[in-house]
Amino acid sequence: MAGEKGGSRDEEREPLTRGSIEFRDSINSFDYSSSTASLSLAVIDRINGSTQDSRLGEKDQRDDDHDQYRNEEEYDVEDADYIPSGGKTVQKTTKIVLWALLFLCVGGWSLAFVIFLFRGHDTPQTSIASEENISSGGARGNRITLDEVLGGEWAPRAHSISWFPGPNGEDGLILEKDNLSATAYLRVEDIVGRKDPKASKKSIVLMQKKMFTVGRETVYSAQAWPSPDLKTVLVLSDQQKNWRHSFTGKYWLFDVETQTGQPLDPGAPDRRIQLASWSPQSDAVVFTRDNNMFLRKLTSNEVATITTDGGVDLFYGVPDWVYEEEVFSGNSATWWASDGDYIAFLRTNESSVPDYPIQYFASRPSGENPKPGEENYPEVREVKYPKAGAPNPIVDLQFYDVGKGEVFSVDVTSEFADDDRLIIEVLWASNGKALVRETNRESDILSIAIIDVLSRTGRIVRREDVNALDGGWVEPTQSTRFIPADPDHGRLDDGYIDTVIYEGRDQLAYFTPLDNPKPIMLTKGHSEVVNAPSGVDLKRGLVYFVVAGNEPWERHIYSVNFDGTSLQPLTNVTESSYYDVSFSNGAGYALLNYRGPKVPWQKVINTPANENSFEAIIEQNDHLSRKLRLFSLESKVYQHVTVDGFSLPVMERRPPNFDPAKKYPVLFHLYGGPGSQTVSKKFSVDFQSYVASTLGYIVVTVDGRGTGHIGRKARCIIRGNLGHYEARDQIETAKKWAAKPYVDESRMAIWGWSYGGFMTLKTLEQDGGRTFQYGMAVAPVTDWRYYDSIYTERYMRTPQHNQGGYDTSAISNTTALASNIRFLLMHGTADDNVHIQNSLTLLDKLDLDDVDNYDVHVFPDSDHSIYFHNAHKMVYNRLGDWLINAFNGEWLKVHKPTPNNSLFRRAETWGGLPV
């Protein structure tokens, strides 16, 4: 699980269409107009905008969970709003008046918007904010099928451009990969040259083919990372998945000039490596194998050993399970200094962390054959998994002097003991200095230290007691941005940009010099920044960031000067839309992603401060535009409800041809984890769309207290008592819907996956059948003592400090659960994230209290995403069919049933024989 980190990441919610849609366009197909360029790119990463992997919490939401330059429905502020209907000519005087009014309106709007962002507002909207209906198939349009949704037919195609820093400071270089090409598998292109070849260098082909031979071995590239000087490519082959983000494989060095390869470690070419990364100077690669670190310099075939005592319980340079899952959201705990002279890395000791056994009954993920006579026993994988209150891994930050070949540590006076410390971010500055972010185990005290590896000294320069500030917590993020000194551009000292708490919101701040604890505030007001900053233009002194706009379901892009002045939108903020963005290394160009509510599109643009005008379409999703003309989808109504004085965002999905005179069943869908967000303007055709569009039920989603972008007061109130306020918000909202004239209050259900599964059960428990009659919980937490320590203690503190909170948050009131008509519980047996222990212990409580109004489905060998052996299709088929039966009244609440004799028929006979 995780709070919103790097954005509200979809992967924290229930998985629906896990795989990205891979596609390859002609790499040379460009069609330019006078003002725009059409660009088709096959790039290294491809993202499915609807992909939803599975985890509790949102690591931001970069989730994430992507047409023309402008959609046909989209317009600029200058467009046709003041052109008279019928195309009549406007008289000159009228034009002057209209232009004057235009400038007054635009100026007034701009002033009002800046005041809004910087001063905020205290009165949230409580009425219907907007209604979206993206399909145009009409009353007789086709209905979507669940197979179409699960098969990805409604998933927007999206590209993730790999921006690449030029060896000589060039901006706007992109890394492209074409798996089908026999002459340009991997290459670097100057995106400006797509529009004006004379203004660009030619493309550089790094690898002609995807495969190459080394001796007798044929190497197939799975991933590839060019060196910063573009002379060598680090190639991964034989990739094998470990956990969510980690993997192992064989690594190779591929020479661009000769188009030949060699093993990264010539002395052990077949041994699997966990992680490898380039020196910023392109002259060395550091890697971890068998939890020890090594260094290969390109000038030699020799491999230097950095550490020697790594093993089962001791990790160097890579995170263990809980740090990978809950802190870094990645597979690396290694950081190169920008000059390549030093390497920082984590030493993780998990010898005290208890093991959790994961059994595999129908598969052997290890790939190893069982011993003779043990073929019929399940394979068991022991995972070091620290549950709440259990011993945590002990982490230390160490450094390696590349020139001296020496490992050392720097003592920094810390208020955190070894077993009470989390290291959540390491950021190199200049001149041998590194910023290190630490928190206590319960993640409510933040400490930032500066370490000088040249003098081997360090000190704490900033401390924040977040618990004392607002009762909240610190999310582990890695979005802090170093800003080097540049007197020519007005920056006398080094500094960094960080997200801070300011007036109850997450805002951007600039700290300079590095040891200055008092920042320059870059943003203020009602709206909150998201995973900021997104990009920094050092030459022009600009910071780009994403903000949840006038409404929490929006995302817009802005820039601001380093001194906090000249706030400017990069997107059209007059439209209620959802954008995200990635910037080139110099922030002169941006991949702008429009993600909804209309059909998503992508384009590369020049940023406003860049004088070189450029615009190129990357993706239009024409296939979705065509489909939408043939289908009838649900309409989405966005609004707010007020519960206990808190304004909460709600999205209601109404069936096609909605008739307010009818009575509709209602399904509530939720996730609800701390910092997460489910109500958004992103385009999505998912399971909820199927329920509303095809089954004809209303689907309601409310982001209750604890979720993201509704202010820290509403977010932090849940701390220490997960489930209580969140369930109340679901119930109170459901009561409001039950009172609506078009809702059948006798047919109301709720469902969720992961944290949403926990919330489903907690809501049913708290409601006791008074509002909801049915529920469906997939892979739920049922007792927070069973979940991992870093996530759980961030929001619940330790069980030793909050036993009462853990007791009340656990699903334990079986009498209340028995008061519902029926509920469904599903879980994968090999779930390494939310262990099946959660569901099994709940079943034991139900057995002890003779509760039987539920159904159970267990998926052998499936992890938290539930995919193994057709399980993903099965889980959604079961959800849909079970819901239909529930709303059809098939699930009867009958305890100790008796035979219905009226159903017996007397046997008919003929000649004494039964017929």
UniProtKB/Swiss-Prot annotation:
Keyword line: Aminopeptidase, Glycoprotein, Hydrolase, Membrane, Protease, Serine protease, Signal-anchor, Transmembrane, Transmembrane helix, Vacuole
Segments of this protein annotated with the region Disordered: 1-20, 52-74
Residues in compartment: Cytoplasmic: 1-95
One GO term describing the cellular component: plasma membrane
Residues at the catalytic site: S754 (charge relay system), D831 (charge relay system), H864 (charge relay system)
GO terms, biological process: proteolysis
Enzyme category, top tier: hydrolase
GO MF, any single term: aminopeptidase activity
Mode of membrane association: Single-pass type II membrane protein
Membrane topology (Vacuolar): 117-915
Glycan attachment positions: N133, N179, N349, N572, N813, N900
Iron listed as a keyword: no
A Pfam short name: DPPIV_N
Purpose: Type IV dipeptidyl-peptidase which removes N-terminal dipeptides sequentially from polypeptides having unsubstituted N-termini provided that the penultimate residue is proline.
Family under the similarity heading: Belongs to the peptidase S9B family.
UniProt name for this protein: Probable dipeptidyl-aminopeptidase B
Source species of the chain: Blastomyces gilchristii (strain SLH14081) (Blastomyces dermatitidis)
